[in-house]
Design a protein with these regions (language model features):
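Active-site rim/loop-helix segments in enzyme catalytic domains that contact anionic ligands
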Residues: 1-101, 128-137
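Metal-dependent de-N-acetylase/amidase catalytic core
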Residues: 1-3, 24, 71-73, 80-217
Length: 217
Protein backbone atom coordinates (compact mmCIF):
# COMPACT_ATOMS: atom_id res chain seq x y z
CA UNK A 1 0.00 0.00 0.00
CA UNK A 2 1.31 3.43 -0.99
CA UNK A 3 0.08 6.42 1.06
CA UNK A 4 0.78 9.95 -0.15
CA UNK A 5 -1.32 13.14 -0.06
CA UNK A 6 -1.29 14.24 -3.71
CA UNK A 7 -1.84 13.01 -7.25
CA UNK A 8 1.69 12.68 -8.74
CA UNK A 9 3.42 11.93 -5.39
CA UNK A 10 3.10 8.24 -6.28
CA UNK A 11 4.56 8.72 -9.76
CA UNK A 12 7.52 10.94 -8.88
CA UNK A 13 8.21 9.16 -5.58
CA UNK A 14 7.61 5.44 -5.91
CA UNK A 15 6.27 4.45 -9.35
CA UNK A 16 9.42 2.49 -10.20
CA UNK A 17 9.12 0.43 -7.03
CA UNK A 18 5.38 0.03 -7.66
CA UNK A 19 6.03 -1.16 -11.24
CA UNK A 20 8.60 -3.70 -10.04
CA UNK A 21 6.16 -5.13 -7.49
CA UNK A 22 3.41 -5.34 -10.12
CA UNK A 23 5.76 -7.21 -12.47
CA UNK A 24 6.20 -9.75 -9.66
CA UNK A 25 2.41 -10.08 -9.42
CA UNK A 26 2.15 -8.25 -6.08
CA UNK A 27 -1.11 -6.25 -5.80
CA UNK A 28 -0.60 -2.56 -5.00
CA UNK A 29 -3.14 -0.03 -3.70
CA UNK A 30 -2.59 3.73 -3.72
CA UNK A 31 -4.34 5.67 -0.95
CA UNK A 32 -4.29 9.25 -2.24
CA UNK A 33 -5.15 11.82 0.42
CA UNK A 34 -6.32 14.78 -1.70
CA UNK A 35 -6.85 15.81 -5.31
CA UNK A 36 -4.08 18.41 -5.14
CA UNK A 37 -6.75 20.97 -5.99
CA UNK A 38 -4.82 23.90 -4.50
CA UNK A 39 -1.71 23.27 -6.58
CA UNK A 40 -0.09 26.20 -8.37
CA UNK A 41 0.84 24.37 -11.58
CA UNK A 42 -1.83 24.67 -14.27
CA UNK A 43 0.03 23.03 -17.16
CA UNK A 44 2.68 24.41 -19.49
CA UNK A 45 1.31 25.97 -21.62
CA UNK A 46 -1.55 26.65 -19.21
CA UNK A 47 -4.68 24.57 -19.78
CA UNK A 48 -6.21 24.41 -16.28
CA UNK A 49 -7.66 26.98 -13.91
CA UNK A 50 -8.65 26.93 -10.24
CA UNK A 51 -12.16 25.65 -11.09
CA UNK A 52 -11.11 22.89 -13.51
CA UNK A 53 -7.92 21.75 -11.75
CA UNK A 54 -9.53 19.28 -9.27
CA UNK A 55 -11.27 17.30 -12.03
CA UNK A 56 -8.20 17.44 -14.28
CA UNK A 57 -5.93 16.15 -11.52
CA UNK A 58 -8.42 13.42 -10.67
CA UNK A 59 -8.41 12.23 -14.29
CA UNK A 60 -4.61 12.41 -14.41
CA UNK A 61 -4.41 10.36 -11.21
CA UNK A 62 -6.75 7.69 -12.58
CA UNK A 63 -4.69 7.57 -15.78
CA UNK A 64 -1.36 7.27 -13.92
CA UNK A 65 -2.70 4.47 -11.72
CA UNK A 66 -3.98 2.69 -14.81
CA UNK A 67 -0.49 2.85 -16.35
CA UNK A 68 0.94 1.40 -13.13
CA UNK A 69 -1.87 -1.19 -12.85
CA UNK A 70 -2.66 -0.30 -9.24
CA UNK A 71 -5.91 -0.02 -7.32
CA UNK A 72 -6.69 3.60 -6.46
CA UNK A 73 -8.59 4.84 -3.44
CA UNK A 74 -9.16 8.59 -3.09
CA UNK A 75 -9.51 9.52 0.58
CA UNK A 76 -11.25 12.87 0.09
CA UNK A 77 -9.17 15.18 2.26
CA UNK A 78 -8.65 18.81 1.21
CA UNK A 79 -5.36 19.84 -0.35
CA UNK A 80 -3.03 21.96 1.80
CA UNK A 81 -5.06 21.22 4.95
CA UNK A 82 -3.66 17.81 5.99
CA UNK A 83 -1.56 19.41 8.73
CA UNK A 84 -4.77 20.79 10.31
CA UNK A 85 -6.64 17.47 10.30
CA UNK A 86 -6.86 15.53 13.56
CA UNK A 87 -3.93 13.16 13.10
CA UNK A 88 -5.47 10.44 15.25
CA UNK A 89 -8.68 10.51 13.17
CA UNK A 90 -6.72 10.29 9.91
CA UNK A 91 -4.61 7.48 11.39
CA UNK A 92 -7.74 5.56 12.45
CA UNK A 93 -9.18 6.02 8.94
CA UNK A 94 -5.98 4.65 7.40
CA UNK A 95 -5.77 1.84 9.97
CA UNK A 96 -9.26 0.63 9.01
CA UNK A 97 -8.23 0.46 5.35
CA UNK A 98 -4.92 -1.25 6.14
CA UNK A 99 -6.66 -3.85 8.29
CA UNK A 100 -9.02 -4.53 5.38
CA UNK A 101 -6.24 -4.84 2.76
CA UNK A 102 -3.65 -6.50 5.06
CA UNK A 103 -0.57 -5.37 3.13
CA UNK A 104 2.94 -6.59 3.88
CA UNK A 105 4.43 -3.16 3.12
CA UNK A 106 3.41 0.51 3.42
CA UNK A 107 5.30 3.23 1.53
CA UNK A 108 4.80 6.82 2.70
CA UNK A 109 6.68 10.07 3.34
CA UNK A 110 9.15 10.42 6.22
CA UNK A 111 7.56 12.95 8.62
CA UNK A 112 9.65 16.06 9.06
CA UNK A 113 11.78 15.34 5.99
CA UNK A 114 9.23 15.57 3.19
CA UNK A 115 9.24 19.34 2.42
CA UNK A 116 5.47 19.94 2.04
CA UNK A 117 3.26 20.17 5.18
CA UNK A 118 0.77 17.73 3.57
CA UNK A 119 3.59 15.24 2.97
CA UNK A 120 4.76 15.45 6.57
CA UNK A 121 1.23 15.21 7.98
CA UNK A 122 0.16 12.27 5.81
CA UNK A 123 3.40 10.42 6.51
CA UNK A 124 2.94 10.92 10.25
CA UNK A 125 -0.68 9.71 10.08
CA UNK A 126 0.30 6.65 8.00
CA UNK A 127 3.03 5.67 10.45
CA UNK A 128 0.65 6.24 13.37
CA UNK A 129 -1.93 4.02 11.62
CA UNK A 130 0.57 1.17 11.42
CA UNK A 131 1.66 1.76 15.02
CA UNK A 132 -1.98 1.41 16.14
CA UNK A 133 -2.22 -2.02 14.51
CA UNK A 134 -1.53 -5.22 16.40
CA UNK A 135 2.26 -5.81 16.28
CA UNK A 136 1.61 -9.28 14.85
CA UNK A 137 -0.22 -7.78 11.86
CA UNK A 138 1.86 -4.68 11.22
CA UNK A 139 3.24 -4.25 7.71
CA UNK A 140 6.76 -2.98 7.22
CA UNK A 141 6.96 0.76 6.56
CA UNK A 142 9.32 2.32 4.05
CA UNK A 143 9.49 6.07 4.67
CA UNK A 144 10.69 8.38 1.91
CA UNK A 145 12.64 11.53 2.79
CA UNK A 146 12.96 14.23 0.13
CA UNK A 147 14.28 17.31 1.96
CA UNK A 148 17.70 18.63 0.95
CA UNK A 149 19.33 17.78 4.29
CA UNK A 150 17.85 14.36 4.98
CA UNK A 151 21.02 12.27 4.50
CA UNK A 152 22.95 14.54 6.86
CA UNK A 153 20.18 14.24 9.45
CA UNK A 154 19.09 10.61 9.01
CA UNK A 155 22.12 8.89 7.51
CA UNK A 156 22.15 6.78 4.38
CA UNK A 157 18.74 5.34 3.36
CA UNK A 158 18.21 1.67 4.22
CA UNK A 159 16.88 0.92 0.74
CA UNK A 160 18.17 2.34 -2.53
CA UNK A 161 16.07 0.78 -5.24
CA UNK A 162 17.40 0.92 -8.81
CA UNK A 163 14.31 1.36 -11.00
CA UNK A 164 16.02 1.89 -14.36
CA UNK A 165 14.60 -1.45 -15.57
CA UNK A 166 11.09 0.07 -15.40
CA UNK A 167 12.13 3.66 -16.11
CA UNK A 168 9.94 4.04 -19.20
CA UNK A 169 6.88 2.98 -17.20
CA UNK A 170 7.83 5.42 -14.45
CA UNK A 171 8.06 8.25 -16.98
CA UNK A 172 4.67 7.26 -18.45
CA UNK A 173 3.15 7.53 -14.98
CA UNK A 174 4.81 10.91 -14.38
CA UNK A 175 3.72 12.25 -17.77
CA UNK A 176 0.13 11.15 -17.06
CA UNK A 177 0.11 14.06 -14.59
CA UNK A 178 0.34 16.54 -17.46
CA UNK A 179 -0.76 19.60 -15.48
CA UNK A 180 2.12 19.07 -13.03
CA UNK A 181 4.80 17.36 -15.12
CA UNK A 182 4.72 19.44 -18.30
CA UNK A 183 6.50 22.41 -16.72
CA UNK A 184 9.17 20.20 -15.14
CA UNK A 185 9.77 18.25 -18.35
CA UNK A 186 9.85 21.51 -20.30
CA UNK A 187 12.56 22.80 -17.96
CA UNK A 188 14.59 19.62 -18.50
CA UNK A 189 14.30 20.08 -22.28
CA UNK A 190 15.22 23.75 -22.10
CA UNK A 191 18.29 23.08 -19.97
CA UNK A 192 19.59 19.91 -21.59
CA UNK A 193 17.87 19.09 -24.89
CA UNK A 194 15.96 15.85 -25.53
CA UNK A 195 18.71 13.21 -25.31
CA UNK A 196 20.49 14.86 -22.43
CA UNK A 197 17.11 15.38 -20.79
CA UNK A 198 16.43 11.64 -20.84
CA UNK A 199 19.84 11.00 -19.28
CA UNK A 200 19.32 13.71 -16.65
CA UNK A 201 15.85 12.37 -15.81
CA UNK A 202 17.20 8.83 -15.57
CA UNK A 203 19.96 10.00 -13.23
CA UNK A 204 17.58 12.01 -11.06
CA UNK A 205 14.64 9.59 -11.03
CA UNK A 206 16.32 6.21 -11.57
CA UNK A 207 16.72 5.45 -7.86
CA UNK A 208 14.00 5.40 -5.21
CA UNK A 209 15.25 5.51 -1.63
CA UNK A 210 13.53 4.68 1.63
CA UNK A 211 14.16 4.29 5.35
CA UNK A 212 12.76 1.26 7.16
CA UNK A 213 10.67 2.61 10.04
CA UNK A 214 11.58 1.23 13.45
CA UNK A 215 8.51 0.75 15.67
CA UNK A 216 10.44 -0.27 18.77
CA UNK A 217 9.33 2.06 21.53
Amino acid sequence: VVIYPHPDDESFGASGTIAQYRKQGVPVTYLCGTLGEMGRNMGSPTFANRETLPEIRKEELINACSKLDVELRMLGYRDKTMEFEDRRQVAEHLKDILEEIQPSLVITHYPGYAVHPDHNAMGAAAIEAVRLMSPANRPKVWAQAISTDYIKELGKPDISNDVTSVFEQKMEAILAHDSQASGIIGQFQKNWGIEDMNEAARKQLGKEQFYIWDFRE
